Amino acid sequence: MTQVTVVCGPPCSGKTTWVREHAQPGDLIVDYDDIAVRLGSPQSHHHHPSMHGKIEAVISRAIAGIKDGRHERAWIIRSGVARAHELAAELGGTVVVIDEPDDVLFARADRRPDSAVTKRAIVEWRAANISRRA
């Protein structure tokens, strides 16, 4: 059976960094942003809406592979806490919430070329997830 860790948290919290620090060679990493870039997105975040269906199709295939036991360990990065818990329950995995204080998140957002969009996404994430963080 595959060991699955679903990692969630607001934009700029360090989800991808945390997974890269904990994953081992050969582990499957399912990361929306990484998939988008591999599919041709010119930016690392906030991809064109037309790409969403293609990205989710790749994620669905990866999840099917996890269910089929094709991987020893898998890491799935999803932003929302509720969806992370749903996936973990579906796959028999665990959830890790990566978070930082807002001042840290906003400082990291300032280093992105799309800082205003990222800051808005942080605020929206907080509004949608604040009561579901654990």
Label every model-predicted segment.
Residues 77-79, 90-109:
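Conserved phosphate-donor/acceptor-positioning beta-strand/loop module used by diverse small-molecule
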Residues 5, 28-30, 94-96:
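Hydrophobic/aromatic beta-strand patches that form the interior of the parallel beta-sheet core
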Residues 21:
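Active-site signature of alpha/beta-hydrolase-fold catalytic machinery across serine-
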Residues 4, 8, 106-134:
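Conserved GTP-binding G-domain of TRAFAC-class P-loop NTPases and closely related GTPase folds
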Residues 24-91:
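Conserved nucleotide-sensing/catalytic segment adjacent to the nucleotide-binding pocket
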Residues 1-5, 71-72:
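Pre-Walker A (Motif I) flank of P-loop NTPase domains
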Residues 14-15:
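Conserved glycine(s) of the Walker
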Residues 18:
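Hydrophobic positions on the alpha1 helix immediately C-terminal to the Walker A/P-loop
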